[in-house]
C-alpha cells in the first residue's frame, strides 16, 4: 500500500461500532427494524422516514458506542488523521470527546448542509491532495465519496457487516 500524508475515516461502522446506538432512537420512535439502513446523512434519512432529527439526536445514546477492537491503536499510530461523516455533529463530537480522540479535522453532516458527506472540504482544510490521501469506510457511499475526489479507498472489514459483503478492492 502506498504511503499517505493523511488517512481520513468515516466514523460510524468504520472506527466505532455504533449500530445499536443508531438503531435505538428509530425503534423508540416507532420505526420497524427492517426499514433502518446505514450510511445516509442523518438529516436526509430522518426527513425521508418522517422523523424529527432533533428528537432522534435527543434519543441517541453516545455511551453505548464503542471503538472497534484496534481502532484506538490504529489512529494512535498515525501522524495525521481526520474524520468525514454523515453523522449529526452533536453526537459525533460527543463520541470523539468521550473516546479521547482528536482528529486533525472532523466534519459532520452540518458541514455538507445535511447532504451526503464530501471529502473535498476535508482535504482543503488539511491541505493534502487527494492522491496523497486514503479514505477508510464501511459502505458503498463511502467508496463513492473517495472516487469523486480521486483518493484511494479501503474497506473497514473489521466491521462484521462490511466483511459479510465481501467488498471489492482494498480491504483492511
PLM regions and their residue ranges:
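Asp-based, Mg2+/Mn2+-dependent phosphohydrolase catalytic module
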Residues: 1-5, 82, 90-172
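N-terminal helical cap/lid subdomain that shapes the substrate entry/recognition surface
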Residues: 2-73, 80, 88-90
Amino acid at each position: 500500500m502506498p504511503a499517505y500524508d493523511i488517512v481520513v475515516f468515516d466514523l460510524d461502522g468504520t472506527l466505532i461500532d455504533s449500530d445499536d446506538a443508531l438503531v435505538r432512537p428509530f425503534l423508540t420512535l416507532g420505526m420497524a427494524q427492517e426499514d433502518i439502513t446505514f450510511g445516509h446523512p442523518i438529516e436526509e434519512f430522518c426527513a425521508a422516514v418522517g422523523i424529527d432529527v432533533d428528537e432522534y439526536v435527543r434519543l441517541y445514546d453516545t455511551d453505548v458506542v464503542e471503538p472497534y477492537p484496534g481502532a484506538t491503536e490504529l489512529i494512535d499510530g498515525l501522524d495525521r488523521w481526520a474524520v468525514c461523516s454523515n453523522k449529526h455533529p452533536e453526537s459525533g463530537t460527543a463520541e470523539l470527546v468521550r473516546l479521547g480522540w482528536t482528529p486533525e479535522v472532523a466534519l459532520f453532516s452540518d458541514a455538507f448542509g445535511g447532504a451526503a458527506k464530501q471529502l473535498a472540504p476535508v482535504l482543503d482544510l488539511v491541505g493534502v491532495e487527494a492522491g496523497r490521501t486514503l479514505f477508510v469506510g464501511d459502505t458503498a457511499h463511502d467508496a463513492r465519496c473517495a472516487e469523486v475526489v480521486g483518493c484511494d479507498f479501503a474497506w473497514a472489514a473489521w466491521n462484521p457487516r462490511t466483511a459479510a459483503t465481501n467488498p471489492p478492492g482494498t480491504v483492511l
